[in-house]
C-alpha cells in the first residue's frame, strides 16, 4: 500500500508529463485495439457453426480455353445432392443455397423491409449447424414459405409470435413464416436474416437449376467425420462426370472439391493482404505509443533521480522501485482505457463505419482475448523497460550525471517513432493515389444523373412511356442487367466448337448504348434484331486483326465495337462484353434525370409510388452504386489516415519531450556558448544535429517498408497505379522537414533566451 501511496503522489506531482503519457497511450490504444479487433474479426469468420470442422463448402475450378482458373464457391444446383448421394457413408447431409442480391424487399402492414435473404432447402439448418428456435425445417419443402432470424422477427413483430404471419415479397408475392432461427453473426460469409424455400425458385421459374445451366448457387456438405475430407474429395470426380463429363480439350470443364468453411474467408488473397497491413499498422502504432511512453519516462530521469535516491536511502529495494513504476504504468493505462471507452461510445457510428462492423461484433467473448493481449503487451513494454532502468540505478550514481548515458536509449526510441511515421505516411499516400485513380479514371460511359431499378412491369412499353412523361426525366432505356452488375456469362466457341473464352452478355434496347454514353470505336449502334455490339477485349480475344464489323457471333451480326468499360469494378480484369439488341425488355429500367439529381431522384421515387401503389419500385443512383463498389477502399483510406494522424501526434509528443529534456540537461552549456559568442544558428545546429542524424536512416527504412507493403496492397486491383520511387523520396523529404521544423520551433525560444537566466538557475 505504501508503494501505491508514493505512486499517486508522484503522478500528482508530474501532472504535465503524465497528461502527455495519457494522451499518447489513449490514442495508441484506441487505434491499436480497433485494428487488431478488426483483424480478429476477419480471422474468426464462419467459426460460429456447430462442429464447424465438419462443415465444408464446395469449390468449383473452371477450365476455360485450356487454362485452369481460380477456385470459386459456386456450383450447379444438383451438385451438392449428387455428391451426398454418391458418398453416403461419409456425408451426413448437404444443402444448396441461392443468395438473393440487390434490393429484395418484404412488406408487412405496408412497411418496407430490406433484409439479407437466401433461398435454401429443408436440410439447410441441419447441414449448416444453425439452431432452430421454433418451427419445423421440413416446411421449406413447400414453395413460398420462409424462416426468419430471431432479431428480424423481433424487429417486425415485437414479442408476438411470427409463425403463420404472411409477408409480401417485393410487395407482390405472399410468403408465410414457418419458423424462427438463431441470429447469424456479422462475421459470416453467408450472412442472412431470411431463408426462403428453395422450391419457390422452381415454381416461379426464377433460375435454371439443371446440369447444363445456372452455376450461381452455393453448395455445403456436412461430413460425419472431419478426417474423411480427403476420402470424399477423391470420390467426387467420378460422381460429377456421370452428369458432366470432364473434357477440358473442348475448351470448358469443371472440377469440384470440398474445403472446410472455416478457412475459406481467411485464405482469400484480398483478406490476407488486408490482415497483413492492418496488423502492421496496429503493431506500429502500439509500439510507437509504448516507446513514446518509455521515452518520456527516461527523459524524466533527471527530475526524478533525487526522489529515487531518497527512497533507496530509506530502505527501498530495487524490487520496491520496480513495483512503483509498474503501479504507475498500470494506473496510467487504466485511465487511458477509460478514455478509450468514452471515445468509443461517443464516436460509435464513425468507428463502426471505419471497421465495417458493429462494436458488438468486434468485441465478442470469442475475440475478447485480442484487446486483453494488446493491453498486457503494452503494459509489459511500457512498464518493465523504464522500471528496470530506474530500479537498477545504484544510490551512488543517482545524484551524478547518470542521465547523460541515456542518450543512446532516447535516440533509439526516436528512431523507431520516425520510422513508424514515415511508414504510415507512405502507405497513406499509396492508398490516396490508388483511390483517386479508381474513382476519377474515365470509365467509358456517363453515369451522371442515371438511376436504375429492377422490376417486371405488366406492360413494359406503358412503363417506359410513363417514365418518359415525368418532368424530372430526360431519357429512358432498359436492359437485362445494370451496367455494373457483371452480366451473365456465355461461352464463345471457334468454328470447331472449341470454347475460346466466356463473354459477359447483356440484352438491351436499341438506344441503350447512346443513352449510357458508351463510345463506339468502329461501326455503328444497334438498330434492329439479330445485331450485336462487342467491346475491344472481345475483339482482342477473338484475335480479329482485320476488324469485327460484319462478323458473326452466334446468330448475331456484329455491327460495332465498343470502347472497353468495366462491367464489375477495377478490382477485376477487363472482360469481353457483348450487347444484344432487342425491341422490348422488361427487367432493368434506366432513367437519366435532369438536375438537381438528388432532389429529382426523390421526386421520381415518389411519383413511382403514386403511379404503382401496389408494387415496390425504387430507383437508385448509378453514380452512388459505383462509389459503393470502392467503399472498402474508402474506409481503409480513412483508417490509414486516422492511423497517420495518431502516430504523428504521438511522435511529435515524443520529439518535443526529447528536445525539452536535452534543453534542460544542456542549458548551462548553451548559456556558456552564447556568452562566448555563439549565434542563434549555432545553438539550433547544436540541438537539431543529433535529431536529423537519427531521423535520416529512420525515414529511409520507413519509406522502403511503405514501398514494399504498398506493392502488396495494390495487387488486389486490376487497374492500379505504378509506384514511382520519386514519390517516396518526396515523402522522406516531407517527414524530415516536419521533424526539422518541429525541432527548430521548440529550440528557437531557448536559443534566443538571455544566457544569464540559465546560469543563475544552475
Language model region names:
Residues 1-4, 9-19, 49, 237-284, ...:
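Membrane-helix entry/capping segments
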Residues 6-12, 16, 291-332, 392-403, ...:
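Intracellular coupling helices
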Residues 11, 42, 58-60, 83, ...:
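Generic structural signal for small/hydrophobic residues in well-ordered secondary structure
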Residues 13-41, 271-306, 334, 338, ...:
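Hydrophobic alpha-helical transmembrane segments of multi-pass inner-membrane transport and secretion
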Residues 34, 241-243, 329-392, 433, ...:
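Small-residue-rich transmembrane alpha-helices
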Residues 35-103, 208, 212-222, 230-235, ...:
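Membrane-proximal extracellular/periplasmic loop immediately following the first transmembrane helix
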Residues 121-134, 146-270, 465, 469-475, ...:
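Mid-to-C-terminal secondary-structure elements
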Residues 382-412:
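Cytosolic-side transmembrane helix boundary signature
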